[in-house]
Amino acid sequence: MARKEFRYRGYTLEQLMNMSLEELAKLLPARQRRSLKRGLTPEQKKLLRKIRLAKKGKYNKPIRTHCRDMIVLPEMVGLTIYVHNGKEFVPVEIKPEMIGHYLGEFAPTRKRVQHGAPGIGATRSSMFVAVK
Protein backbone atom coordinates (compact mmCIF):
# COMPACT_ATOMS: atom_id res chain seq x y z
CA MET A 1 0.00 0.00 0.00
CA ALA A 2 1.39 3.41 -0.98
CA ARG A 3 2.22 5.92 1.74
CA LYS A 4 -0.41 8.63 2.00
CA GLU A 5 0.76 12.10 0.95
CA PHE A 6 1.20 14.49 3.89
CA ARG A 7 -1.29 17.33 4.19
CA TYR A 8 -1.57 20.02 6.87
CA ARG A 9 -5.11 21.38 7.12
CA GLY A 10 -5.70 20.38 3.47
CA TYR A 11 -2.47 21.88 2.08
CA THR A 12 0.42 19.85 0.66
CA LEU A 13 4.00 20.43 1.81
CA GLU A 14 4.84 22.26 -1.44
CA GLN A 15 1.90 24.64 -0.96
CA LEU A 16 2.96 25.28 2.66
CA MET A 17 6.54 26.01 1.54
CA ASN A 18 5.30 28.71 -0.85
CA MET A 19 3.18 30.47 1.82
CA SER A 20 4.37 33.54 3.71
CA LEU A 21 4.58 33.42 7.52
CA GLU A 22 1.34 35.45 7.79
CA GLU A 23 -0.58 33.01 5.56
CA LEU A 24 0.86 30.02 7.43
CA ALA A 25 -0.02 31.57 10.81
CA LYS A 26 -3.72 31.54 9.83
CA LEU A 27 -3.56 27.72 9.60
CA LEU A 28 -1.81 27.16 12.94
CA PRO A 29 -3.49 26.63 16.34
CA ALA A 30 -4.18 29.74 18.45
CA ARG A 31 -1.08 29.60 20.69
CA GLN A 32 1.31 29.28 17.72
CA ARG A 33 -0.65 31.85 15.71
CA ARG A 34 -0.37 34.43 18.51
CA SER A 35 3.34 33.66 18.90
CA LEU A 36 4.02 34.28 15.19
CA LYS A 37 1.78 37.37 15.17
CA ARG A 38 3.97 38.96 17.86
CA GLY A 39 7.01 38.40 15.66
CA LEU A 40 10.09 36.25 15.99
CA THR A 41 12.65 36.89 18.74
CA PRO A 42 16.25 37.70 17.75
CA GLU A 43 17.28 34.11 18.65
CA GLN A 44 14.52 32.69 16.45
CA LYS A 45 15.53 34.97 13.56
CA LYS A 46 19.15 33.82 13.92
CA LEU A 47 18.04 30.16 13.87
CA LEU A 48 15.85 30.78 10.79
CA ARG A 49 18.81 32.44 9.03
CA LYS A 50 20.98 29.37 9.74
CA ILE A 51 18.21 27.06 8.49
CA ARG A 52 17.86 29.00 5.23
CA LEU A 53 21.65 28.90 4.70
CA ALA A 54 21.70 25.14 5.43
CA LYS A 55 18.93 24.55 2.87
CA LYS A 56 21.04 26.35 0.24
CA GLY A 57 24.10 24.29 1.26
CA LYS A 58 26.12 27.27 2.53
CA TYR A 59 26.02 26.24 6.22
CA ASN A 60 27.61 22.83 6.70
CA LYS A 61 27.95 22.71 10.52
CA PRO A 62 25.20 21.02 12.56
CA ILE A 63 22.46 23.49 13.51
CA ARG A 64 22.46 23.75 17.32
CA THR A 65 20.01 25.85 19.28
CA HIS A 66 18.76 26.68 22.76
CA CYS A 67 15.61 28.11 21.16
CA ARG A 68 13.07 25.50 22.32
CA ASP A 69 10.14 27.89 21.72
CA MET A 70 10.69 28.02 17.94
CA ILE A 71 7.68 26.77 15.98
CA VAL A 72 8.47 24.12 13.36
CA LEU A 73 7.92 25.76 9.96
CA PRO A 74 7.64 24.01 6.56
CA GLU A 75 11.08 25.27 5.46
CA MET A 76 12.69 23.27 8.30
CA VAL A 77 11.42 19.90 7.01
CA GLY A 78 14.22 17.48 6.18
CA LEU A 79 16.87 19.09 8.40
CA THR A 80 18.32 17.76 11.64
CA ILE A 81 18.38 20.41 14.34
CA TYR A 82 20.18 19.84 17.64
CA VAL A 83 17.93 21.20 20.42
CA HIS A 84 19.32 21.80 23.93
CA ASN A 85 17.45 19.97 26.69
CA GLY A 86 19.25 21.66 29.61
CA LYS A 87 22.18 19.25 29.63
CA GLU A 88 23.04 18.33 26.04
CA PHE A 89 21.96 18.89 22.45
CA VAL A 90 19.41 16.30 21.30
CA PRO A 91 19.24 15.64 17.53
CA VAL A 92 15.73 16.24 16.17
CA GLU A 93 15.04 15.26 12.56
CA ILE A 94 12.24 17.51 11.32
CA LYS A 95 9.40 15.63 9.59
CA PRO A 96 6.31 17.15 7.91
CA GLU A 97 4.09 15.88 10.76
CA MET A 98 5.95 18.19 13.19
CA ILE A 99 4.80 21.42 11.50
CA GLY A 100 3.08 23.72 13.99
CA HIS A 101 4.70 22.15 17.08
CA TYR A 102 7.50 23.65 19.17
CA LEU A 103 11.09 22.34 18.88
CA GLY A 104 11.17 21.82 22.65
CA GLU A 105 8.43 19.19 22.42
CA PHE A 106 10.87 16.83 20.70
CA ALA A 107 13.76 17.22 23.19
CA PRO A 108 12.52 16.07 26.62
CA THR A 109 14.12 17.88 29.57
CA ARG A 110 13.54 15.11 32.12
CA LYS A 111 14.70 11.51 32.05
CA ARG A 112 12.46 8.67 33.13
CA VAL A 113 13.34 7.54 36.67
CA GLN A 114 15.01 4.13 36.81
CA HIS A 115 14.93 2.98 40.42
CA GLY A 116 17.46 0.44 41.64
CA ALA A 117 16.76 -2.36 44.11
CA PRO A 118 15.48 -1.17 47.50
CA GLY A 119 18.11 -1.01 50.25
CA ILE A 120 18.02 -2.46 53.73
CA GLY A 121 15.44 -0.69 55.87
CA ALA A 122 13.49 0.47 52.85
CA THR A 123 10.55 -1.83 53.60
CA ARG A 124 9.02 -3.11 56.85
CA SER A 125 10.11 -6.68 56.19
CA SER A 126 13.76 -5.74 55.67
CA MET A 127 14.08 -3.75 58.91
CA PHE A 128 15.16 -6.76 60.94
CA VAL A 129 17.48 -8.36 58.40
CA ALA A 130 21.03 -8.56 59.72
CA VAL A 131 23.51 -6.31 57.96
CA LYS A 132 26.40 -8.80 57.56
UniProtKB/Swiss-Prot annotation:
Disulphide bridges, residue numbers: none
Superkingdom as given in the UniProt entry: Archaea
Residue ranges of the TM segments: none
GO molecular function term, any single one: rRNA binding
InterPro entries: Ribosomal_uS19, Ribosomal_uS19_CS, Ribosomal_uS19_euk/arc, Ribosomal_uS19_SF
This protein's record includes keyword RNA-binding: yes
Gene3D superfamilies from the UniProt entry: 30s Ribosomal Protein S19, Chain A
Pfam families xrefs: Ribosomal_S19 (PF00203)
Stretches of the chain forming a coiled coil according to its record: none
Single GO BP term: ribosomal small subunit assembly
Keywords: Ribonucleoprotein, Ribosomal protein, RNA-binding, rRNA-binding
Record function comment: Protein S19 forms a complex with S13 that binds strongly to the 16S ribosomal RNA.
PANTHER family documented for this protein: RIBOSOMAL PROTEIN S19P FAMILY MEMBER, SMALL RIBOSOMAL SUBUNIT PROTEIN US19
Name by which UniProt lists this protein: Small ribosomal subunit protein uS19
Species whose genome carries this gene: Pyrococcus abyssi (strain GE5 / Orsay)
